[in-house]
């Protein structure tokens, strides 16, 4: 009754205050990694920037900022450009920028014999696989059990609905050059994917390229088309051809440094990120490779969860490299602290373990503090 007797503006003011408080509590209930996953639904990349003094200390003293690409600092932008964590040091001060990207899609246009192993192997190496074909007998979940999506539709319409992003990897393996041209034509109207490859003989590929160039297709984009698709390994069977295709995709993702577009080259296991977001209350430590030199078993960005009861999820390389940090990780659980651990695989200890990697890693070990304040925006 008292509320109804108040001026209308007063009711609105109280309602707005309540909404603001609700939103603050909603963010507080979402841990850092939940916030990252949520933001990645609407942005192509994020940089988690940490700064701290000393190789070990309290998490409360660590500055943490989560920024979108355009808002990132110089070191954050460098991490996004390189596609993996970047570590800067000045005396005892550390600055670490860790990039995060949505899980990349592998879009397979065509559901024929080659598409089967490409979809399977693509899912196994961490892609979210989408298969498109205009024939129901070739585009159904039973045929592609490891695909996240199987779409039976006209190629042009399906491509339009998929809204191709710069983080996508696309294989054109249709049954004829007319469909190849339709796919290329539609893809050329939107954002350029990280990888675009097309199967076919040199003659078939040449016909399609010439046709589209005469229509006004961008010659520079056409020059980046991987066709004939795959690395030259002499593959004959569908499985061998699929291996050559995935090898080329991995090469573009990991090694194509001349391509200045932002790409995810981090060694992060996306399943680890999801687990961190989904189980905020269980005691654990988070282990992240922040710098890697030489032939270390895992690259920068590799992340592992260590539980108090001995369970682990993810890996930073196994063997002596992993054993060196497991004890440190368990000792930090519940402490509210962090520590940088240096792992040297060039010495006698590594040789005794049969490790011939010869690399060096800097690993950030953090207690997963459930009461830690959210990152600054």
Task: Name every feature range the model reports, one short phrase each.
Residues 1, 14-134, 141-144, 168, ...:
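Segments forming oxygen-rich coordination pockets for charged ligands
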Residues 6-7, 22:
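Cationic, low-complexity basic patches in intrinsically disordered or flexible, solvent-exposed regions
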Residues 115-118, 178-183, 204-207, 298:
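Short glycine/serine/threonine-rich phosphate/pyrophosphate-binding segments
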Residues 136-138, 203:
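Helix N-cap at the beta1-alpha1 junction of Rossmann-like dinucleotide-binding domains, i.e.
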Residues 148-154:
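Conserved SAM-binding strand-loop segment of SAM-dependent methyltransferases
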Residues 156-165:
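Short amphipathic alpha-helix with an adjacent loop that forms part of the alpha/beta core around
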Residues 169-177, 185-211:
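ADP-ribose/adenylate-binding Rossmann-like module
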Residues 199-271:
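Adenosine-phosphate binding glycine-rich loop
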